[in-house]
Amino acid sequence: MTELLEVEGLCAGYGAAPVLHDVDLRLAPGTITAVLGANGAGKTTLLRTLSGLLRPSAGRIDLTGRDLIGLPVERRVMLGVAHVPEGRGVIGELTVQENLRLGGLWRKGAGARRETDVAIAEVYDLFEPLARRRGYHGHQLSGGERQMLALGRALVARPKFLLLDEPSLGLAPVVAASIMALLRTLRDASGMAVLLVEQNVHSALAIADEGVVVSLGRVVARGKAADLQADEGLRHAYLGF
């Protein structure tokens, strides 16, 4: 299968403090890849670097044949990259509808507004609570609804490659389970590739096709999600169970 994303020799950090070291990654269309590891391993830094929020010091990021190094966030969004950060980034002063419309601001031309309207309608079909609260402001929503809104805003961009950082953080178990199940539905329906950082290792591996384990900024293991789940030594050494 042709790879959607290819990452080679990626190094990144903050100022003089390196975090990622020679990270290689391959993602195929229609797959979910879980990024696993302890706090401080470099998982969020990896997502920030791929989305364009952090400039790497070395390496290559190739999306469908296009090198993303040096491209700003907005350009990456236009090419099909969407990022749902930890903390969700919902703007509390804006309504649900206004937050969703932000996901389509990059579109230009006569049909841009119509295309965004159609994408927003599709999000409301996926997330009925948002449809019922489209006039509510972000600060009026529950944690689960804010996560739906953050994910929905990313989907308005119709991404090829979705980066998700801790989507279940702070959510009730039943809400977190529904969000995770939806990721599989989205993968199957859209064919997009998902890179998932998730604190709940069991939940992440349950929905993922592949997994990579990161320790001290390096990929120390990779493979099928079921194989990682079954590797007792790996679990004890890096995953805490």
Regions of interest found by a model, annotated:
Residues R55, D67-R88, G92, R113-T116, ...:
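ABC ATPase NBD coupling module
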Residues H137-L141, E145:
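Conserved ABC ATPase signature
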Residues G15, T33, L71, V96-V118, ...:
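ABC-type ATPase nucleotide-binding domains, specifically the catalytic core motifs of the NBD
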Residues S51:
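Helix-to-loop junction immediately C-terminal to a conserved catalytic motif
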Residues A154-L155:
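ABC ATPase C-loop
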Residues L36-A38:
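The feature captures the beta-strand-to-loop junction immediately N-terminal to the Walker
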Residues A177-G191:
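Helical segment within the ABC ATPase nucleotide-binding domain
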